[in-house]
């Protein structure tokens, strides 16, 4: 039963939770229980309210990295996954992706990810050091290899990279996730707390509201 109180849809008499972050982890199909633990941990890590907010992570999509270099792309699963991600991106519903490098490069070439130097500032990028992943002169991602995050939540991708989707309208929460993942690195945590970083976030959010065209 779905009810409506004039402002919110309610399921079985309870208000539906507000989604505050959504991500895709491609080629790393997981049990629902593991994905749920990851979602709950991310929500807590970014300071979300478990009673009214939620983080959604989709781990069901698969892509053949070799097929991405074909024209046209013949692999049906890859086609379907590309279409799903494209739909989320154009709807501004997708905030981050965790991908193996070959797949990540495909999306970097489509300018799918925000430039972390512009989004985070020089201090945070310097603190992340060699983990910053560059493609075509853009700091488009951060490598997650050997982090506690990938070990704890069963991410077995070879050289996984995380990127913030350029069209995301929830970049502040996405950056909060990065801060949480690397919180054991004192330099990164300090950089994310710096005034330079706060100014970057404020400027980026203002620009997005002004033009409404950040895709």
Where are these regions (language model features)?
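Extracellular/periplasmic catalytic domains that process cell-envelope and extracellular macromolecules
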Residues: 13-16, 89-91, 108, 154-157
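A bilobed periplasmic-binding-protein/Venus flytrap-type ligand-binding module shared by bacterial periplasmic
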Residues: 157-170, 189-191
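Extracytoplasmic/periplasmic/luminal assembly and interaction segments
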Residues: 29-94
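Periplasmic-binding protein-like
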Residues: 125-163
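Gram-positive cell-envelope targeting signals
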Residues: 1-26, 186, 192, 196, ...
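Solvent-exposed loop/turn segments at secondary-structure junctions
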Residues: 27-30, 102-106, 168-169
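Short amphipathic alpha-helical coupling segments at ligand-binding clamshell hinges
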Residues: 169-180
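Extracytoplasmic "Venus flytrap"/periplasmic binding protein-like
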Residues: 79-133
């Amino acid at each position: 039963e779905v009810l409506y109180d004039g402002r919110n849809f309610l399921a079985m008499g309870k208000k539906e939770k507000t989604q505050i972050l959504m991500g895709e982890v491609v080629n790393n199909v997981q049990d629902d229980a593991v994905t749920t633990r990851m979602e709950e941990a991310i929500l807590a890590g970014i300071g979300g309210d478990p009673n009214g907010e939620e983080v959604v992570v989709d781990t069901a999509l698969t892509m053949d990295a070799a097929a991405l270099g074909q024209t046209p792309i013949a692999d049906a699963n890859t086609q379907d996954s590309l279409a799903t991600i494209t739909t989320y991106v154009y709807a501004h519903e997708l905030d981050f992706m965790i991908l193996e490098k070959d797949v990540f490069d495909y999306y970097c070439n489509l300018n799918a990810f925000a430039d972390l130097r512009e989004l985070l500032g020089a201090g945070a990028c310097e603190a992340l050091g060699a983990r910053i992943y560059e493609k075509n002169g853009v700091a488009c991602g951060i490598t997650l290899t050997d982090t506690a995050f990938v070990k704890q939540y069963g991410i077995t991708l070879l050289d996984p990279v995380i990127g913030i989707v350029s069209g995301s309208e929830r970049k502040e929460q996405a950056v909060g996730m990065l801060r949480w993942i690397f919180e054991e690195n004192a330099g990164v945590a300090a950089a994310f707390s710096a005034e330079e970083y706060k100014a970057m976030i404020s400027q980026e959010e203002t620009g997005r509201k002004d033009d409404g065209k950040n895709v």
